[in-house]
Amino acid sequence: MRKLRRREEGSLVLEEGDDDEGSRRWLRLDEDAIRLGYHSPPCTLDAQQFGQVVLKMAPYHLTLGDLDYDHLEVVYGFDLEYQGNHDQLVADTLFSEGPLAGLLTHESVTHAIDVQPFLGVSVSESCDTQVYVEIKSHTSAYEIRTQQYDAQQLSVFLTARKYWGITESESLGDVHRALTAIAEEWAAERIVPLVVNPLAQAIASGR
């Protein structure tokens, strides 16, 4: 990573250009947070190792300690390109049955314009370890009104989060490994089969 720049709001960003496969790593230092990412990694292990290296070095170079930590997140993102009404696709695919279906399919409804579910659960008794899933559409009211859609990414985000100060302290590396394991399990057993695949199949069918 050799591209270093400062954003208008003051953040420092270190990144690399896309390789032949579209992979790209980046690191951002905000006033109150360290953020890093690996876009389209060759495998999830590469992304995990990148995170481990950064989290191992950060406390020494930035003089960080347990009192500086609020929470650590591991986020998996899945992008599905779709040229159409993202909100309608989500409504038809994930909310076609159940009590909420009556709201979305009522005879007075002409279009779904904002269907972006955001769900969170605790996976620990102390509620310090949490998992969230969020679906983000990128369809505007103008596109729906004119029926002229751009091909854009419908995004599904899976977040595993751990808060500090509730249970016994652990190192950043240990927490990162634990959160990565949780995210891997949730992605493989729940998010991909229950959310990503149904949406991908609906897009492929031309819904």
Feature roles, as predicted:
Residues 26-64:
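Hydrophobic alpha-helical segments and helix pairs
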Residues 19-23, 58, 138-143:
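Short amphipathic beta-strand starts and helix->beta connectors
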